[in-house]
Amino acid sequence: MASSTAQSKKQFKRSMTKKSHSWWWDSHNCPKNSKWLAENLEKMDDRVNHMLKLIEEDADSFAKKAQMYFQKRPELIQLVEEFYRMYRALAERYDQASGELQKNHTSEIQSQSSLEISSPTKEKLSRRQSSHKEEEDSSSLTDSGSDSDHSSANDEDGDEALIRRMAELELELQETKQKLLLQQESVDGDNNVDLLHKITTYEGELKEANEKMRMHEDEIANLKNQLQSFMSFDTEDHLGAEQKSVDLDKEDTKEDAVATKVLALEEELSIAKEKLQHFEKETYSLKNELEIGKAAEEKLKSLQHELELAQRDADTYINKLNAEKKEVLKLQERLAMVKTSLQDRDNEIRALKTAVSDAEQKIFPEKAQIKGEMSKMLEERSQLGEQLRELESHIRLIKEEKAETEEKLRGGTEKISGMRDESNVLREEIGKREEKIKETEKHMEELHMEQVRLRRRSSELTEEVERTRVSASEMAEQKREAIRQLCMSLDHYRDGYDRLWRVVAGHKSKRVVVLST
C-alpha cells in the first residue's frame, strides 16, 4: 500500500511538472481592471489544482478498491474541464466588459465636469442658499420621517436578502434530500433513515418559519406605512392648526410609543432571524456528519467484503493443506509398508542364499531353479527401490507445496488480522459518529423546542401587532375627530369675526353721517 501511494504521488508530481492537461488556460492574462476578479481567479485556480490532485493522486488505490470510482473518474475530470473552461471564459469576458465600462465612465465624468465648470457660480450659490433655507424650514418636520424611511429601506433590503437566502437554503435542502434518497437505495441504515426523516421535518418547519417571517414582515411594512401616513397627516395638521399643538403632543407621544413597540418587534424579528441562521448552520453540519458517516459505512462494508474474501481464501488454503496432509500420511504409510516388504524380501533372500549354499551340495539339480527365483527377487527388489525413490521425490514435492501453502496461510492470517484491526478502528469511529449524531439529535430537539418557543413568541408578536394596529386606527379616528372640532371652531370664530366686522363697519358709517350733518 505504501509503495503504491508513493508511486502515485511521484506520477502526480511528474504530471504537474509537465502540465499534461491540454485544456489548462496558460495563455490567459491576469485581469487588471478588477482586483476582486483577480483574487477569485487565483482562488479558482488553487481549488481546481487541489481537485485534480485529489482525483489523480488517489486514483490507483481507489481503482484497486472500487471499480466504480475508476469508471467515473474520467467523467469527473471532464466535468472539471468544462467547469474550468466556462469560468475562465466568463472571467475574460467580464474583464473586457469592465474595461470598456471604465473607459465609458471616465469619458462621461470628463464631459460632465466640463459642463459643470462652464456654468456660472452665482446660480450655484443662490441654489445652495435657497436649498439651505428650505432644509432648515423643513428639518423639524422631516427628520423623523427621513430617519424612519432610511431605517425601513435598510430593513427591507435586509429582509429581501434574508428571503433570498432562505430560498437558496430550501433549494439546497431539496437537492440534499434527493441525494440522500438516491444513496438510501443502495445503503440500508436505520440511523440514516432517521436523519433523513428529521431533515425532512426540519425542512417543513423551516418553510413554516419562512411563511411566518414573511407574514411578520408584511405586517411590519403595513405598520410602517401607517406610521408614515400618520406622520404626513401630522405635518398637515401642524401647518393647518397651530393652536391645537398642545393637544396633539399627547397623540405624538402615543405614536412614539407605537413606534417603540414596532422597533421592539423588529428587534424580536432580527433575533428570530439570527436563530434561524444558527438553525441553518446546524442542519448543514448535520448533513456533513451524515455524509462522513455514510462514507465510513461504505468503507467498512468494502473492508468487510475484503475480509470475507480473505477468509474464504484462507478456508480454501486450510482445506487444501488438510488434504495434502492426508495424502502425505497415506504416502508415509505406503512407504512404511514398502520398507517392511523390502525387509521381508531381504530376509527371504538371505534365507534363500543360506538355503542355496546348503542345498548346492545336497541338491545340485535344483540349483538352476533357485538361481532363477533369486534373479526374479532381485528384479522385484530393484522395482521396489525405484518405487521408493519416486515416492520420496513425490513426498519432497508435497512438502514444498505444504511450505508454500503455509506461507500463503500466514500472509492471509496477517492480512485478516490487519483487516480486523482496521474494521475495529472503523467500528470505534462509527460508534463515535453515532454518539455525535445522538448529541446532534438532542441538540436538534432543543432547537425544535426553541423553534416552538419562537413560534409562540411570533404568535404573541402578531397579537401585539394587531393590538398596535387597532390602537393606531383608534388614534387616527381621534385625530379626525379633533380636526373636525378644530374646523368647526375655526368656522365659528370666522363667523363671529365677520359679524363683529359688520357691526364695527356699521358704527363707523353712522358716525360719519352724524359728523357730516
From Swiss-Prot:
Gene Ontology MF terms: actin binding
Biased composition annotated in UniProt, kind: Basic residues: 10-21
Record has Transcription as a keyword: no
The keyword Coiled coil is assigned to this record: yes
Coiled coil: 156-486
GO cellular component term, pick one: membrane
InterPro entries reported for this sequence: NAB (IPR011684), NET_actin-binding_domain (IPR051861)
Biased composition (Basic and acidic residues): 121-135
Keywords recorded for this protein, A-Z: Coiled coil
Positions of region (Disordered): 1-29, 101-159
Compositionally biased tracts (Low complexity): 107-119
A Pfam family per the record: KIP1
Domain NAB: 21-101
Recorded family membership: Belongs to the NET family.
Function text: Plant-specific actin binding protein. May be part of a membrane-cytoskeletal adapter complex.
Protein name: Protein NETWORKED 4B
Source organism: Arabidopsis thaliana
GN (gene name): NET4B
